[in-house]
């Protein structure tokens, strides 16, 4: 990593309903670009698909290159809390698409919020009765 190379942070929020990608500078203070699966596909049911995530990632890569970024550190987040702890189908597709677009990939970290014995899951004592 040379001194004159410009790096940023790509925050990927991937749920089973959508994938949202936000690129910030290395401090995280200034947002460079933001795209989601819902912005690039027409049907709501396709928002969370890997195709939508790849399309959003290529637009993110173009915006980042335009601003002079050479590489991105990746921060992947799932809904977490009382929801799913694993990211949706768009997370892996996003990272692959960024790498294919010519962006260098730095650190990849998982920032999913995990409760440390907070509130209980919805459903009550006996669970959801169907």
From Swiss-Prot:
HAMAP family registered for this protein in UniProt: Ribosomal_uS11
Family to which this protein belongs: Belongs to the universal ribosomal protein uS11 family.
Subunit structure as annotated in this protein's UniProt entry: Part of the 30S ribosomal subunit.
Gene Ontology cellular component annotations, sorted alphabetically: ribonucleoprotein complex; ribosome
Lineage: Archaea, Methanobacteriati, Methanobacteriota, Methanomada group, Methanobacteria
Pfam family, one: Ribosomal_S11
Annotated stretches, region: Disordered: 109-130
Name of the featured protein: Small ribosomal subunit protein uS11
